[in-house]
Amino acid sequence: MISYYFQGFALGAAMILPLGPQNAFVMNQGIRRQYHLMIALLCALSDLVLISAGIFGGSALLMQSPWLLALVTWGGVAFLLWYGFGALKTAMSSNLELASAEVMKRGRWKIIATMLAVTWLNPHVYLDTFVVLGSLGGQLAMEPKRWFALGTISASFLWFFGLALLAAWLAPRLRTAKAQRIINILVGVVMWLIAFQLAREGVAHMHALFN
């Protein structure tokens, strides 16, 4: 059964490593050393719920509800455009230290709300967990399925805590004005690129619904 664990771990790692909204948010919180371990835990727990739902049968709900998929997609587009705009606005600020200080003033609950939006309004999360993992893990018998899910969940926990701790460790180098400007530009551009990609997918979904 251990082979199913490592299959799940490898697939989970492959899906979570690319830079996306979740990773960017965890990295920034790590650099700020602001509730970064709490955010890593909440991201990993969110993945645990989504992965379990996808592998143990929840994928059918998404696949059979095109309007739900469309709603999640356009909600994700709106959020990513807003999130990217905020990052670019901070990067282009004439007083980057003041802009960064304003971000640091955000309370715990606002940070948690942003994390939940970053996770649950990202349609790619549902495609990864419900479609990819659901189609692969759903074919397995119950015992191998459990090991496969455990491997995928382990990759998520290891990655988010590793990213948060690494970012916090590198914080003295990454907190400089130049580094912060580069990071915010990178995050903003990536968020907008993902948003435009999702918008194209959303248009295709809407076209399919009305034809």
Swiss-Prot record:
Instruction: Provide the Gene Ontology terms for cellular component.
Output: plasma membrane
A Pfam family this chain is assigned to: LysE
Report keywords, A-Z.
Answer: Amino-acid transport, Cell inner membrane, Cell membrane, Membrane, Transmembrane, Transmembrane helix, Transport
Highest taxon, organism lineage: Bacteria
For membrane topology, the record states: Multi-pass membrane protein
Compartment(s) of residence: Cell inner membrane
The reply to whether Cell inner membrane figures as a keyword in the UniProt entry is: yes
Say what the protein does: Involved in the export of arginine. Important to control the intracellular level of arginine and the correct balance between arginine and lysine.
Protein name according to UniProt: Arginine exporter protein ArgO
Organism equals Salmonella newport (strain SL254)
Designated gene of the protein: argO
